[in-house]
């Protein structure tokens, strides 16, 4: 028998105690990795179609401290986590041309018109909210599915403190 912390431990239990110690260490490491460094978010809805589909799991980094245009980020708004793409950074100017394309600092950034010019009243209503200077400390976010306007076109720029991390990869998991 061997004494551990003043308690005598029979020899047959020593391998189990070593295993238990390794498991505790492993669980602590996993907690640190996924509680502090990384996170996993679930895509909810069709706002990021076709790139991120409803129900997909996305690995994101919580440690990201500098974002760039076109980064996909997880953010929180009104208690709900959502994914969106950064269209413009703080202090950049977002504008819309007469064909409905969004521009950042004078350069067309959207791959297609974000607002149809067929419905003139809707187009003019959206067009009249531009040009828009992104305030310091905020980001202008845009969904990949332009028909879903639940993004900065509707509620303005998002505070940097509401960005939870940068998407790194989708996780291909079945039947969850």
Language model region names:
Residues 2-17, 21, 39-42, 50-176:
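Soluble "head" domains of membrane/secretory-pathway proteins
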Residues 20-37:
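Hydrophobic membrane-insertion alpha-helices, especially the h-region
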């Amino acid at each position: 028998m061997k004494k551990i912390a003043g308690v005598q431990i029979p020899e047959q239990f020593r391998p189990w105690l070593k295993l238990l110690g390794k498991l505790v260490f492993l669980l602590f490491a996993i907690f640190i990795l996924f509680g502090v460094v990384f996170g996993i978010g679930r895509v909810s809805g069709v706002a990021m179609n076709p790139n991120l589909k409803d129900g997909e799991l996305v690995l994101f980094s919580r440690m990201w401290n500098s974002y760039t245009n076109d980064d996909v980020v997880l953010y929180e708004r009104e208690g709900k986590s959502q994914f969106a793409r950064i269209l413009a950074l703080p202090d950049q100017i977002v504008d819309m041309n007469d064909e409905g394309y969004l521009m950042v600092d004078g350069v067309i950034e959207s791959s297609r018109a974000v607002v149809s010019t067929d419905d003139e009243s809707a187009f003019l209503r959206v067009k009249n909210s531009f040009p828009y200077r992104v305030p310091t400390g905020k980001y202008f976010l845009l969904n990949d599915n332009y028909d879903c306007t639940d993004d900065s076109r509707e509620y303005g720029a998002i505070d940097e403190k509401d960005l939870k991390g940068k998407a790194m990869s989708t996780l291909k998991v079945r039947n969850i």
